[in-house]
Structure formats: structure tokens, C-alpha cells
């Protein structure tokens, strides 16, 4: 039965879990599809994936795809298509979901290892269930190290060795440079290239490093601009606005400058909000906003009809005022 993958486009955990599927099953790169957590991004990916599957009976692995409640019907469409055609669906994830959605999705899948997991990311779950203890690859030592790197990256833990830390940065910056292209064949090809490099037993390539370095320079420049005009929400949060920053670094820069508990970076290009916290559970706020993630790192979509843009100080203040109200209800209500 042919293997397909639908995974998270925006970080190395999504790409890493797909790379392990390629190692385990020899899955063709053309069978790997990517999505973010937006309705538009998911609809694009489901359409492309469905066209590729056609009427075949296949096994679909869905990895690192946190379930935002409002997207469940879209996910169900592809799951039901695969099942109707005699295929199987396996879902590996580690994000915070509502219990009701966990039960709904688990009942539809053949295998579902889902819900909050503070120990293992999606790449680790994939490795532990499909590769660990099996001589599937001559690169087992490499795979163990790669999975460790992904764990450090996804749980925001800094490795001791500088080269490992730099590799995490290379992944983050190169992936971000590709996803700024938006859902497209060009984006997907570049992300598949990263997966091919990893599946072949290499951590990176000259092109990945070069693309990451270019985006890093841009990211640093835009971050400096963002930090000149931050918005404070009580004694708990600061908000910054900028197009297409790497979210962890954007929030980290806000935290470093303000020493706040919750840093909120608003991607003005994608209309998404990104949260990082030292203390508070950010999923309480992100889920209220229609998003999700991890306790100390999460995100949410922004309604384009209600907030059409953030080009002016007035439009940003309007959104910050809205956020302040949601924070009040979430943490002090």
C-alpha cells in the first residue's frame, strides 16, 4: 500500500517526522504534503493531496498537526476519503487538543497517538514507533542524533554544542524562508528538498545553509525595527508587529528586551499571532483565539475580516486593546 504524508510545514518537527517516514517506507517525496494551521493553508494542502491520491487505496500518515477545533471538518474530509477507498490513517502528534476532539479524531484513525505530550515531539513519536530497534537504515546513528536535535528544537532547549545550536537555527531560518512563499508548489519543493537531505543521512546542505543565512540577516533587520515600537498589556505581556519573522526568535527578542511573562509576535503578512511564555500556559489564550500549540509556545489565526491590516498605529492599538480584553478574561477572569 502506497505511503503518503501530510505534515506541518513550519518547523523541523513536521519535516523531520516526514523524513523518518521516507526512511522507514521509502516513501516518494512527491507523496509528502505540507500545511500550516490556517484554514486557507489546510484547504490548499488537502486539495493537492486528494488529487495526488486519486482513487488509490493508500496509508496516510498525519504528523505534527495540532488540532484547532475549527479545522476538524476539513481534516475529516481527507480522512474519510482515505478510509472510503480502503486505506488507513495514522496520526502522530503531541500538541494540546481538547478532549472532545481527541476522541473524535481517534475514532476515525486506524492509529492515533495524539494529545499533549511533554516528553516527545512528533519526530520522536514517529521514530519510537516505526524505526527504533529496527535495522531499517545504515544511518541509525545519524537518525538518533537527528531526532535528538529535533527534540531540542521543538521544546526550545538549547544544546550545549555550538554546532548543534547553529544547526537548529539553520533549520528554523531556511524553513521560514520557504514558508514565506505561501502555500505553493515552489514552497513544497523546497521543503521536500530538506526532507530528502535528511532521509539521505545528512543534517544539511550548502543550499539549506545559504538560504537560512540569507533569511537570518533579514530576520535580524526586521526584529530591530519591531523592537522600536512594542505595545504593553498590563504587567503580563508585550506585543510586537512585523512581517514574516521566525516566531520563536521574534518572541524571544521581545522577552529579552522587556523581561515580560508573555511575548506576542503578530505576523502582519500571514495574519497570525505567536505566543511564548516563561511562566503562563499560552494555550489558554491561543485556544480562546482559535489556535493551539504547547503550554509555553503556541499560536492563533487572526480574523482578516475583523482586523484587515496593521499598517497604522491606530490599527495596531485596536488589536492590542482586543488582545488585552482576551488576556484579562483568560488569566484574570
Predicted regions and their residues:
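Short acidic, S/G/P-rich loop/turn micro-motifs used as interaction or catalytic elements
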Residues: 37-39, 66-70, 246
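Divalent metal-coordination and catalytic microenvironments
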Residues: 11, 21, 64, 93, ...
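Short alpha-helices
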Residues: 101-183, 187
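Gly/His-enriched, cation/cofactor- and phosphate-binding structural elements
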Residues: 2, 55-57, 84, 206-333
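A short helix->loop->beta-strand "cap" motif at the edges of active sites that frequently abuts
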Residues: 83-89
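Short, structured active-site "lid" loops
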Residues: 46-78, 83
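Anionic-ligand anchoring segments at beta-strand to alpha-helix junctions in alpha/beta enzyme folds, i.e.
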Residues: 2-50
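Long, charge-rich alpha-helical interaction segments
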Residues: 177-214
Amino acid at each position: 500500500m502506497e505511503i503518503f504524508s501530510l505534515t506541518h510545514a513550519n518547523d523541523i518537527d513536521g519535516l523531520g517526522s516526514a523524513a523518518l517516514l521516507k526512511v522507514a517506507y521509502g516513501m516518494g517525496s512527491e507523496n509528502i504534503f505540507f500545511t500550516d494551521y490556517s484554514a486557507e493553508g489546510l484547504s490548499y494542502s488537502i486539495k493537492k493531496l486528494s488529487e495526488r491520491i486519486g482513487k488509490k487505496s493508500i496509508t496516510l500518515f498525519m504528523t505534527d498537526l495540532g488540532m484547532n477545533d475549527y479545522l476538524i471538518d476539513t481534516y475529516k474530509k481527507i480522512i474519510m476519503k482515505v478510509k472510503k477507498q480502503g486505506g488507513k490513517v495514522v496520526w502522530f502528534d503531541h500538541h494540546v487538543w481538547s478532549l472532545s476532539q481527541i476522541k473524535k479524531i481517534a475514532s476515525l484513525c486506524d492509529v492515533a497517538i495524539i494529545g499533549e505530550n511533554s516528553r516527545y515531539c512528533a519526530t520522536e513519536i514517529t521514530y519510537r514507533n516505526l524505526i527504533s530497534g529496527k535495522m531499517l537504515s545504515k544511518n541509525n546513528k545519524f537518525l538518533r542524533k537527528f531526532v535528538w536535535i529535533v527534540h531540542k528544537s521543538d521544546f526550545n532547549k538549547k544544546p550545549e554544542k555550538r554546532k548543534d545550536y547553529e544547526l537548529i537555527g539553520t533549520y528554523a531560518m531556511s524553513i521560514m524562508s520557504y514558508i514565506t512563499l505561501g502555500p505553493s508548489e515552489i514552497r513544497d519543493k523546497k521543503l521536500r528538498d530538506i526532507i530528502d537531505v535528511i532521509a539521505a543521512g545528512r543534517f544539511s546542505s550548502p543550499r539549506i545553509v545559504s538560504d537560512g543565512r540569507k533569511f537570518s540577516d533579514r530576520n535580524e533587520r526586521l526584529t530591530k525595527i519591531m523592537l522600536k515600537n512594542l505595545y504593553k498589556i498590563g504587567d503580563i505581556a508585550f506585543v510586537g508587529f512585523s512581517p514574516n519573522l521566525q516566531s520563536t526568535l521574534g518572541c524571544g527578542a521581545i522577552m529579552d528586551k522587556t523581561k515580560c511573562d508573555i511575548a506576542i509576535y503578530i505576523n502582519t503578512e500571514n495574519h497570525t499571532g505567536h505566543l511564548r511564555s516563561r511562566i503562563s500556559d499560552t494555550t489558554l489564550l491561543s485556544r480562546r483565539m482559535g489556535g493551539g500549540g504547547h503550554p509555553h509556545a503556541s499560536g492563533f489565526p487572526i480574523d482578516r475580516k475583523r482586523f484587515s491590516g496593521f499598517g497604522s498605529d491606530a490599527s495596531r492599538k485596536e488589536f492590542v486593546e482586543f488582545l488585552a480584553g482576551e488576556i484579562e478574561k483568560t488569566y484574570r477572569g
